[in-house]
């Protein structure tokens, strides 16, 4: 193992020259090189122990270089024999200089590439290929090698002996080496190797040395502080990425989130990131961002910070996890790290990207006119399924909303969107304004905010609350008028007064009714079928606008309940048509179910209205050559001419 890691020192260039000599017979050169510092060093080398400090001693270099390419292979070979280091150990002891090289090299020599190849890169590739096979977890991260590259010789010799004893003591488990190396690993990627062996505690001595080595290396000066942190780092094994990613904000974050000791170290800039995340196991990335601003001022108590962030954030469950002692969160963190921002399954993950989308996403969903029902159902499912179950703590949700919601009042806008998006939720916006308002404080915020699935969860509760109103609203709300409902809903949400909300809700639905695009479409087809003759006559008369518009009228009168809906609906329909129902140029408006241009219709040759208008326009066949008509027709089609459309000509 050591060979592999120390190999990077080749980058130093001192050894770069040697490889050419050594390449032909790595074994010979290794024997020749008498640079082994001491018996202890030789022994350790035989064992395959690599000391971060000993990166550049020529003695070590020999095996290293040969092994550079197969670096991991020897590792796997050596590692398996941790319990029985004797092969290497005995060999090393018996013939210290030659044996270590022999034992380590024989396999590697086969592998070794001509000296010319840049070893570090090869090693990286090899490690990538072998990684995860024999190496102890600590070896797995590729990052460690770079630091050794920066090692200085002074570290190597003095440190090798000093570190040698600890490895021997702990030698029996292969981890000791890993652990010893772990300081380096951890420094580089505190958690990349979720260290299966937390021997770091036992290895405290080596870790400190490793820390010093790291400083000497300058490999990861920022992480140098992690020497002490390494132990917490073990618990925070999964947080390596976070360390790197959050490093800038980490010092600030750690003090609030990490335990005091962690906080101090965090200021060090060492494992602080790890500390932060371990301490607040369930912190969501959003919360981290939120806390980012906090750092300038204060290290708030861990519990307070996470809880405040969560409350602002809408995470009820997180608070518990975060406030817990770092150790507990650390365990969670170990599970968590893969998605650093998610929380452990138990906790409701209030990602702020979940809560924030509540506003925009709401709008988007509503505009998309995804079924009112579909939207809420989808949201609830998404949260409950993969992320953990928000549903279980609906009560908590309600209670939490009280404190949490007030701040995010800015999310209120989505509220009016709510009525629109769903039959399920629309009940909410209207009735919640109505009934939840009586339970004033918490419920009022929900209407305003209703950001997370939290509301959707209570949603089930809400429907019972106002069954009558809810149903009415849901019926009306399929697509609340985009514009009006927002204004109305805004009134609803902000104004707790129950009356305004219901009244507003009721008026809005009629307005919105013309809008319902999805449902009416199907209805339209049927209705058209039923009264097709009559309608066809109407159209022939040119009573109404183009097909879509008339259809809107027809639909609207039902919801508006007005025969007079015809004209009024016409306008609404016009808006609808303009917005949603662009008829494609040749789409058949009221065609037979077959959608064919055929005589099934009372008015036969039912081409798209603009086409039929052109065709039916009185043409002076003598005066206007056919190509003129063609041009006009094609122009209208290309432009999808609304204005040329029957709106103008259609009276014929």
UniProtKB/Swiss-Prot annotation:
**Region of interest called Interaction with GGNBP1, as start-end residue ranges on this chain:** 123-486
Q: Which domain of life is it from?
A: Eukaryota
Keywords on this record?
A: Developmental protein, Differentiation, Phosphoprotein, Spermatogenesis
Pfam families associated with the record: GGN (PF15685)
Q: Where is the composition biased (Low complexity)?
A: 213-230, 251-267, 299-312, 407-422
* InterPro entries noted in UniProt: GGN
Keyword hit for Phosphoprotein? yes
Q: Which residues carry this modification: Phosphoserine?
A: 389
Composition-biased stretches (Pro residues): 138-149, 163-178, 428-466, 495-513
Q: Where is this region: Disordered?
A: 1-39, 52-237, 251-273, 291-473, 488-576
Residue ranges, annotated region (Interactions with ZNF403/GGNBP2 and OAZ3): 491-652
Q: Where is the composition biased (Basic residues)?
A: 523-532
Spell out the Polar residues composition-biased ranges: 201-212
Q: How does it assemble?
A: Interacts with FANCL, GGNBP1 and ZNF403/GGNBP2.
Q: What is this protein called?
A: Gametogenetin
User: Can you name the source organism?
Assistant: Homo sapiens
Name of the gene: GGN
């Amino acid at each position: 193992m050591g060979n592999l890691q120390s190999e990077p020192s080749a980058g130093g260039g001192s050894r770069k020259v040697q490889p050419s000599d050594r390449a032909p017979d790595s074994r010979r050169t290794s024997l020749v090189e008498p640079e082994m510092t001491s018996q202890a060093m030789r022994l350790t080398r035989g064992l395959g122990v690599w000391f971060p400090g000993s990166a550049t001693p020529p003695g070590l270099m020999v095996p290293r270089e040969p092994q550079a390419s197969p670096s991991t292979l020897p590792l796997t070979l050596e590692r398996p024999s941790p319990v029985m280091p004797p092969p290497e150990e005995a060999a090393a002891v018996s013939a210290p200089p030659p044996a270590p090289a022999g034992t380590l090299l024989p396999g590697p020599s086969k592998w070794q590439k001509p000296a010319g190849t840049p070893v570090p890169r090869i090693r990286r590739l090899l490690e990538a290929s072998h990684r995860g096979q024999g190496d102890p977890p600590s070896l797995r991260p590729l990052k460690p090698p770079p630091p050794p590259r920066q090692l200085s010789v002074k570290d190597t010799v003095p440190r090798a002996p000093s570190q040698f004893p600890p490895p021997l003591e702990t030698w029996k488990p292969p981890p000791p080496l890993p652990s010893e190396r772990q300081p380096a690993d951890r420094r580089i990627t505190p958690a990349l190797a979720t260290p299966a062996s937390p021997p770091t505690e036992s290895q405290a001595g080596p870790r400190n040395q490793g820390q010093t080595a790291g400083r000497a290396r300058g490999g990861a000066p920022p992480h140098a502080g992690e020497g002490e942190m390494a132990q917490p780092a073990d618990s925070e094994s999964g947080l390596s990425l976070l360390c790197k990613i959050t490093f800038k904000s980490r010092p600030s974050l750690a003090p609030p989130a990490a335990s005091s000791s962690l906080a101090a170290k965090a200021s060090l800039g060492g494992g602080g990131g790890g500390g932060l995340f371990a301490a607040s196991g369930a912190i969501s990335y959003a919360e981290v961002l939120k806390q980012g601003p906090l750092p300038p001022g204060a290290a708030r108590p861990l519990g307070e910070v996470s809880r405040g962030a969560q409350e602002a954030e809408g995470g009820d469950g997180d608070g518990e996890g975060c406030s817990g002692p770092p150790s507990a969160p650390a365990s969670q963190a170990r599970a968590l790290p893969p998605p650093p921002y998610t929380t452990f399954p138990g906790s409701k993950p209030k990602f702020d990207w979940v809560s924030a989308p509540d506003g925009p996403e709401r709008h988007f969903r509503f505009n998309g006119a995804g079924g009112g029902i579909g939207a809420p159902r989808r949201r609830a499912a998404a949260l409950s399924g993969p992320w953990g179950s928000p549903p279980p703590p609906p009560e908590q949700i309600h209670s939490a909303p009280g404190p949490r919601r007030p701040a995010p009042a800015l999310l209120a806008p989505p509220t009016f969107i709510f009525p629109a998006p769903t039959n399920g939720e629309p009940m909410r916006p209207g009735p919640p304004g109505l009934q939840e308002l009586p339970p004033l404080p918490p419920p009022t915020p929900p209407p305003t905010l209703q950001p997370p699935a939290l509301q959707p969860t209570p949603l089930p509760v809400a429907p019972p609350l106002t069954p009558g109103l809810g149903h009415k609203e849901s019926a009306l709300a399929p697509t609340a008028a985009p514009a009006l409902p927002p204004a109305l809903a805004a009134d609803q949400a902000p104004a707790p007064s129950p009356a305004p909300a219901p009244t507003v809700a009721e008026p809005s639905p009629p307005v919105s009714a013309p809008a319902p695009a999805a449902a009416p479409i199907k209805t339209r087809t049927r209705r058209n079928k039923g009264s097709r003759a009559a309608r066809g006559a109407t159209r022939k008369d040119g009573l109404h606008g183009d097909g879509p518009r008339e259809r809107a009228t027809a639909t609207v009168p039902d919801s508006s309940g007005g025969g007079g809906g015809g004209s009024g609906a016409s306008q609404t329909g016009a808006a609808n048509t303009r917005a949603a129902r662009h008829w494609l140029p040749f789409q058949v408006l009221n065609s037979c179910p077959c959608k064919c241009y055929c005589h099934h219709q009372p008015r036969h040759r039912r081409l798209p209205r603009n086409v039929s208008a052109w065709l039916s326009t009185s043409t002076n066949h003598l005066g206007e050559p056919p190509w003129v008509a063609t041009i006009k027709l094609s122009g209208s089609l290309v432009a999808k001419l609304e204005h040329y459309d029957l709106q103008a000509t259609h009276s014929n």
